[in-house]
Swiss-Prot record:
It comes from Arthroderma otae (strain ATCC MYA-4605 / CBS 113480) (Microsporum canis). The alpha and beta chains are autoproteolytically processed from a single precursor protein within the mitochondrion. Belongs to the ArgJ family. It catalyses: N(2)-acetyl-L-ornithine + L-glutamate = N-acetyl-L-glutamate + L-ornithine; L-glutamate + acetyl-CoA = N-acetyl-L-glutamate + CoA + H(+). It is found in: Mitochondrion matrix. Its EC number is 2.3.1.35, 2.3.1.1. Catalyzes two activities which are involved in the cyclic version of arginine biosynthesis: the synthesis of acetylglutamate from glutamate and acetyl-CoA, and of ornithine by transacetylation between acetylornithine and glutamate. Heterodimer of an alpha and a beta chain. InterPro entries: Arg_biosynth_ArgJ, ArgJ-like_dom_sf, ArgJ_beta_C. CDD domains: OAT. This protein may be expected to contain an N-terminal transit peptide but none has been predicted. This is Arginine biosynthesis bifunctional protein ArgJ, mitochondrial.
Amino acid sequence: MAPKQIRTIGQVSQYVCLLSKPVSPVSGQVRQFTSPVDASIPASKQKFVPSSGTYPKGFKVSGSHAGVKASNTSAPDLALVWSEEPCSAAAVFTTNKFQAAPVQVSSELIRKRNGNGIRGVIVNAGCANAVTGKKGLQDARSMSKKADECNGLKEEDSSTLVMSTGVIGQLLPIERILNKVPEAQSNLASTHAAWLRTARAICTTDTFPKLTSRSFSLPSSPDRTYSIAGMTKGAGMIHPNMATLLGIICTDAPIEAPVLQSLLSHSISRSFNSISVDGDTSTNDTVAILANGAAGGTPISSTGSKDYTAMQSILTQFTQSLAQLVVRDGEGATKFVTVRVKNSPSYTDAKCIASTIARSPLVKTALYGKDANWGRILCAVGYTPDLTPGTVVPERTSVSFKPADGSAELKLLVNGEPESVDEGRASSILQHEDLEIVVDLGGGASGEAGRGGEDAIYWFCDFSHEYVTINGDYRT
């Protein structure tokens, strides 16, 4: 059975915050359920928090303190992202059957508006507003309406998407939140400081705010500069279909709603649907992108245009960087692992195998222990369910470690035959934070290795003692 994909609804905006540089996780970093402030960001990660940015025209943001979680007495936990003009929007949502109230409300809003006329996103951290019944739905709608009202909108249908993250099964302190929305609106700004504070406001067990931005051009307007910015949160309960992961992406490029949804869906399948921290899929996952066209130019209206092809590459790279950043901040993580499955008869089967390896507790714990136990990797390949017959042929399968320093691969298994492994070199490779595992299927039964075989990439982290500590103490 192929890995499930994040469900796409209508035309929704995607918002995602990422860092442009890799982040080094710190073992033993104690995580508190609150938005990180400067003093709590691990020293090794502070340098990856951007000191400046290039932000899209027409967007303003704010991060305010509402005290959603009683223990949070000062950190921002209410975020507002707002466009001065109506946006095309696209979004993807969790496929968990117990979809949180904000997921239901936002997906409904996008369907009603066909991805048009969206103005912003309001987010609270500290309470997921999931499995909260009719009251939870009412509260999510109230947040959307309040954001509209504070920005002078009085339409019957709301135009603000809603996101929440935190503990499941608890009602929002809704009056506390609603009373702070006017402050969030008055604090809206387009400065780097405002974007950074907003990225902090959506964090929970994250150890640092994840924010990035970049400029780009399109073939139809090579002299025109566009910008894209994103923020995200996520460190645990991470596995497609997305998993306590919220992402907000904003761009000033002109993109029509149906095309925007196509762009987002393509990028998600190769980014957020290709990561895993712990194999759990959250009730609240949402990634949205908003495009307000404020930078001008010819709107992207066709999937067959050169602008569409260029934008597809830009957005996919952007979301991949963000997705990788989430893995790098995985709860208790000490390793950032890329698993590449090569020469498969199909992309779907290759991705399914990569996902199975990434979710294996035995593989993850071996990597944490710096144990080159490649048998666990091979075992995961062998028990991957519902593959197309002939995908995995033992005598054609090879496994190797690819070091982060660019040196030669360490071959562990070649065409089904074990290699004489240099344990010293294997141990040296596993001392590094970054590692790539390469599984070559040799074309499966077809034997088409190197001649058009399909490849898939997945990113994951290891399991450490700290992961258990963090999640054992999550509600305390």
